[in-house]
Amino acid sequence: MKKGGFSNNLKLAIPVAGEQSITKFLTQSGTFKDGDLRVNKDGVRIISQLEPEVLSPIKPADDQLSLSDLDMVKVIGKGSSGVVQLVQHKWTGQFFALKVIQLNIDEAIRKAIAQELKINQSSQCPNLVTSYQSFYDNGAISLILEYMDGGSLADFLKSVKAIPDSYLSAIFRQVLQGLIYLHHDRHIIHRDLKPSNLLINHRGEVKITDFGVSTVMTNTAGLANTFVGTYNYMSPERIVGNKYGNKSDIWSLGLVVLECATGKFPYAPPNQEETWTSVFELMEAIVDQPPPALPSGNFSPELSSFISTCLQKDPNSRSSAKELMEHPFLNKYDYSGINLASYFTDAGSPLATLGNLSGTFSV
């Protein structure tokens, strides 16, 4: 691939001139709407095509969480579109993550918020971060999410540098269970799988989060062609503008496993620099260079094979999430003897310490 030779079909997810007003997304009663999604100060729901145009008001359930019942403890994440706060329920003492997104932003981000709300509302899987409730009020969307007190794998890697084989197997077995649910049960491509979107907790659980750039296909074999997500973990077929499917997430998974095994991002910057100075040079490296692999030495052949199976340039040569669950790397260990909860705690995860709760969530 020559420098600057990206496909003319490449679609960058950037704001466009003349974006539509926020009023397009609001009803006269102040309900946030997008397609079949409705959110207001009382909650969220997905309407069916059979429901009439004039809808009955969204009514809060008796056991529903309310924003007024939550006390803010600390800001644990910031982004261009909002913040994530650690909050505590006044009556039960339970902690939650409250993601607050202001809607005075461009239409592309509003559409991404709507997509995340739809997936959160309709997904039930123990390997995805739980979304308990969503609200729209005073110009902001608020999502009450499960609080993962160990932070992200990106945070964890800063402490441990690299993760041993047996723990890697236990961690990514859980991640794959989440991907099987997304890919095969829901026909969803995550499109932004990376260490900061894999969260851990004191129970040793690992869960996938952040569905803002995910897309829903009509079936498991569906293809998409939109250029969104984090470039570092993007598959070659997505970078060049080709259509892509669930296997693009498998490429991202392979890069994440490789990074967790070595403690380093798989694509080394040129000239021994610390970081890539140009995202386009990085994307060219992903497309032009051979797939990265584990260095020879201190790694099991099963782990090396697992990563190689994920990092195939041709997506048709990659295994699916279901097929990867049968890989020897995920079946060589006795998981009853692998205590991820103790490993996360002993290895330096910032578990349950309110003075050290930064970087846990992204917006």
From Swiss-Prot:
Matches recorded under Pfam families: Pkinase
Phenotypic consequence of residue 226 to A: Loss of interaction with MEKK1. Normal phosphorylation by MAPKKK5
Keyword Transferase in record: yes
Entry keyword annotation includes Glycoprotein: no
Domain of life, per lineage: Eukaryota
One Gene Ontology biological process: response to cold
GO cellular component terms, semicolon-separated: cytoplasm; plasma membrane
InterPro entries in the cross-refs: Kinase-like_dom_sf, Prot_kinase_dom, Protein_kinase_ATP_BS, Ser/Thr_kinase_AS
Enzyme class: transferase
Domain named Protein kinase: residues: 70-330
Consequence the record notes for mutating residue 220 to A: Loss of interaction with MEKK1. Normal phosphorylation by MAPKKK5
Sites of Phosphothreonine modification: 220, 226, 230
Function in brief: MEKK1, MKK1/MKK2 and MPK4 function in a signaling pathway that modulates the expression of genes responding to biotic and abiotic stresses and also plays an important role in pathogen defense by negatively regulating innate immunity. Plays a role in abiotic stress tolerance and plant disease resistance through activation of MPK4 and MPK6 by phosphorylation. Acts redundantly with MKK1.
Listed name of the protein: Mitogen-activated protein kinase kinase 2
Species of provenance: Arabidopsis thaliana
